[in-house]
Structures are given as C-alpha cells and as structure tokens.
Amino acid sequence: MAELFYDADADLSIIQGRKVAVIGYGSQGHAHALSLRDSGVDVRVGLHEGSKSKAKAEEQGLRVVPVAEAAAEADVIMILVPDPIQAEVYEKDIKDNLKDGDALFFGHGLNIRYGFIKPPAGVDVCMVAPKGPGHLVRRQYEEGRGVPCIAAVEQDATGNAFALALSYAKGIGGTRAGVIKTTFTEETETDLFGEQAVLCGGTAALVKAGFETLTEAGYQPEIAYFECLHELKLIVDLMYEGGLEKMRWSISETAEWGDYVTGPRIITDATKAEMKKVLAEIQDGTFAKNWMDEYHGGLKKYNEYKKQDSEHLLETTGKELRKLMSWVDEEA
C-alpha cells in the first residue's frame, strides 16, 4: 500500500525558512505561489520578459522578477512552465544560478525521468504534484481544506529532501488531504499512460468511434452526440464520486447488464495488448523523444491532428447543440 503523510507528518517551518521561486504563473503556478505566500513563505514569481501573466501576479500581491533573478535569489526553485520548454528555461536561466544545498522542484517528472534536465549533484531534486487543477488547489486551500498531492525525491543531496517536499506540500494545503509518496519514474510513466490510454486518447477515440458507428448507420448526428459524448459527464461524475460501484448503482439494470456483457467486447484482450505497447513506449522513452522532436520541429503533425478533429462532424454537431444548453459556458 502507498505511504500517506498528513499535517502532523510535515514541518511547515522548513519551507518557511527557505526562499522559494515559482517559475511560471499558469494553472498550478498561481495556486502554488499564492498558497505558499499565505502560509508565510518568502515567495517570488519568475517570468520571462513580456509575460502576460506578470500583471495578474502583481495584482495578486506577488513580486515578479525575471527567471534568472528569481533562481539566483531563491534556494527552492519550483519549475511550473510547460514540459517542452522546461529544459530550455533550465539551461538558460536556472542552471548557472544553482548552488549546493539548493532544491529543484517539479510538478511533473518528465524532464527528469527522460534526462532532458540533468541537475548538478549538490542539489535536492523533488516533486510535489497536486492531483487536481490549480484553481481547485487554490480554492481548497482558501477554504481550509486541501487537494491530495504526490511527492517524490529523485536526488537527496542534503539528506533532508523528503522533509522539504512534505513541508512544501503542507504550504499549499496538500497534507490536509494527504500526500502519497512516489518516485519520479512512477509518476511520469503512470501519468503519461493515463493521459494517452484512458483519460484523453482512449476516451476521445472511444467517443469518436461510437459517434461514427451511429451516424454511419443512418442515425441523426444530434442523437449520436447526446448518446456518445454529452452523457459521458453523467457517468464520469458518478465514477468520480464513488467508483464503478456508485455508477452501476445509479444507472438502470438494462444499462448495467449492457456494461457487463458488451464492455469486454469493446475493450478486448487485443486492446489491452496495445495498451501494454503504449506503456512500453513510455517506459523506454520513445514517446518522450517523439513528442520533444515534434514540439521543437514546429508542431506540424500536432496541428494537423488538431485541425482534423476540429472539423469532425462530432465537433461541429456539438458546437450547435451546446447553444441549446444555457448551463454550458462555451467560453470556459
């Protein structure tokens, strides 16, 4: 079973005694910086010249400085810019400002796991990753609660890296809910697999295949959209609240019987075998290399895929149907 840590296991004074730089001010960056500040931590935000986030961070009472200056001032540096640019930011603005005893923190392990960033031997390398979007992390913190986090140490130069990670997690409210100890390898590989095989890739492909099966059989696209995409939220919400058991308790017996007898015909042994291939490509670095090559090569295929899906009948049908739904905010 996983090791869990709570408020009583973490010493907030450790992070309160450090100088923290949060690099980036997106979804997670703003939640980390504001919550650490409110926990009595000395925080500055590091942003590149011309960042649109600068005004927002300053309006919220945070000190904003260039990334290199933030890294030079701080002894705990949390990198929360997008994965594909982390190595560039590290090489340009952070690497030469690291001192022995400093700590390099990440919210996701990709760049460490695949060696795109190679920290010096004298610094701690840690991860603190809330299992929820930044706005939820911040809201829960403000309400006196927290979002569960995972924490890991890749390099313990000081001998106190995990205690520092727990202290950081406490500063953003994570230990109120619970912190699970993991490794950079486990977090990275399971996160990428979940995104690709289930949450994003698997779900999107399943929805499209179901929609196409119905429309190709002559059913109206609008009806197919409701049955294969719109109602997915109802099911996922039930699973989120109480697992498969609550979902099955809440649906009709007809739907539940169909679940048992038809689900295995859709997700077959062949599907699971393909999932294992996907996992192997994540484990051996193939996916990470291909993604970085695609990103730094100009995102040609990425943009082609994006354009194709935006023109799919599923998307054009949904865009029109959502106009009928006053409770759905198209701008959100």
Swiss-Prot record:
Enzyme class: oxidoreductase
InterPro entries in the record: 6-PGluconate_DH-like_C_sf (IPR008927), KARI (IPR013023), KARI_C (IPR000506), KARI_N (IPR013116), KARI_prok (IPR014359), NAD(P)-bd_dom_sf (IPR036291)
Any single Gene Ontology cellular-component annotation: cytosol
Protein EC: 1.1.1.86
Chain sites annotated for binding Mg(2+) 1: 191, 195
Catalytic activity: (2R)-2,3-dihydroxy-3-methylbutanoate + NADP(+) = (2S)-2-acetolactate + NADPH + H(+); (2R,3R)-2,3-dihydroxy-3-methylpentanoate + NADP(+) = (S)-2-ethyl-2-hydroxy-3-oxobutanoate + NADPH + H(+)
Pfam families hit by this protein: KARI_C, KARI_N
Record: residues binding NADP(+): 25-28, 51, 53, 83-86, 134
Note on cofactor: Binds 2 magnesium ions per subunit.
Active-site residues annotated for this sequence: 108
Residues annotated to bind Mg(2+) 2: 191, 227, 231
PROSITE patterns: KARI_C, KARI_N
PANTHER family in the record: KETOL-ACID REDUCTOISOMERASE, MITOCHONDRIAL (PTHR21371:SF1)
General function of this protein: Involved in the biosynthesis of branched-chain amino acids (BCAA). Catalyzes an alkyl-migration followed by a ketol-acid reduction of (S)-2-acetolactate (S2AL) to yield (R)-2,3-dihydroxy-isovalerate. In the isomerase reaction, S2AL is rearranged via a Mg-dependent methyl migration to produce 3-hydroxy-3-methyl-2-ketobutyrate (HMKB). In the reductase reaction, this 2-ketoacid undergoes a metal-dependent reduction by NADPH to yield (R)-2,3-dihydroxy-isovalerate.
Protein name in UniProt: Ketol-acid reductoisomerase (NADP(+)) 1
Gene source species: Streptomyces coelicolor (strain ATCC BAA-471 / A3(2) / M145)
